[in-house]
Amino acid sequence: MPLINMPDFAGALLDDFAARGAARVDTPVIQPAEPFLDMAGEDLRRRIFLTESETGESLCLRPEFTIPVCLSHIENATGTPKRYAYLGEVFRQRREGGNEFYQAGIEDLGEPATARADARAINDAIGILHKLLPGRPLTVMLGDQAVFEAVVKTLGLPSGWQRRLIQAFGDSTHLDQLLKTLASPQTAHGLDPAVEALLSSGDEAGLIAHLDRTMEDTGYSTNASRSPREIAARLKEKLALAETRLDGAALLLLREFLSLELPLSEATAALAGFADAAGLSLGAALDGFEARIAALADLGVDLSRITYRAAFGRPLDYYTGLVFEVALSGETAVLAGGGRFDRLLTLLGAKHTIPAVGFSLWLDRIELARAR
């Protein structure tokens, strides 16, 4: 038995999911914690309720549905494309509202026409909310991590810095801190003077030998930790990242991109103009962006209600492209949110790459909005 009452519109919502070709899937409330800790992002990791089995396995109360639905799909070895629907309780530590609440949504797995699948996810989220909140105008905020990644990859940064920036996408405070760091070279702090001297001289063999001796003297086993060679490689990367500086023109370029915010109907032209003026090629990322807008138009979605913000992301690490959120016009509470997560199923154990997109509905917030 659930500890809180299911929303009174749950039955109608499940019927709507079925009409949209999404089959309901149930997943256990108790989940293995590792996938969420590894892939869900720092914001969600802080909110997870963790526990442990008698055998020492790390477990958690289900904090969201995307990872459990994907694990269920892999476990049952069903074919694709497949549309799944879910409705149930999730558990998160929250500053406002209860720690236990209902979410529902659709996960679209294996649809090769990614632009069409993206558009369908946005259209479904809007359509469902219009049914649940008739006559209430909605706004949509849209971002695209693939476009951001394409811009970052043109800057000539080391791969470690590229990863840092991409992982910070959507977290404006963290991203701004990284850009400030890139504006002026830093020094690597906390290094042993001997290690620092060997790194500065470029004597890799000497560094490995020094680390090997240190590990032997302190009793560290290479079987239980990284080898001296692996540690040396990480230290070299740490030093390179600390000393990396992004020149003023490139930094200005990145900040200019992140400042873009405009109606979605104008976004393709704005991105193409930005790329041309900067001498960049955004390639497949821009092509996919344009194809998604065309697919939205084909579905009759009102593009004037959608805003593209280049810096907009969602606080989950598994997103790879489209990200979006839907709210009532003039309000900040997110009623629906989702995006594309093409790498997630492979990371969870799928044998082949499975393109995927989906969205979740915050039923407690929708219930409050219906009551007003």
UniProtKB/Swiss-Prot annotation:
UniProt pathway: Amino-acid biosynthesis; L-histidine biosynthesis; L-histidine from 5-phospho-alpha-D-ribose 1-diphosphate: step 1/9
GO molecular function: histidine-tRNA ligase activity
InterPro entries referenced in this protein's UniProt entry, alphabetically: aa-tRNA-synth_II (IPR006195), aa-tRNA-synth_II/BPL/LPL (IPR045864), HisRS-like_core (IPR041715), HisRS/HisZ (IPR004516), HisZ (IPR004517)
Subcellular location: Cytoplasm
Gene3D superfamilies documented for this protein: Bira Bifunctional Protein, Domain 2
The UniProt record lists the keyword Cytoplasm: yes
Key words, A-Z: Amino-acid biosynthesis, Cytoplasm, Histidine biosynthesis
GO biological process, one term: histidyl-tRNA aminoacylation
Function: Required for the first step of histidine biosynthesis. May allow the feedback regulation of ATP phosphoribosyltransferase activity by histidine.
Record text on subunit structure and interactions: Heteromultimer composed of HisG and HisZ subunits.
Family recorded in the similarity comment: Belongs to the class-II aminoacyl-tRNA synthetase family. HisZ subfamily.
Misc. comment: This function is generally fulfilled by the C-terminal part of HisG, which is missing in some bacteria such as this one.
Stated name of the protein: ATP phosphoribosyltransferase regulatory subunit
Organism field: Allorhizobium ampelinum (strain ATCC BAA-846 / DSM 112012 / S4) (Agrobacterium vitis (strain S4))
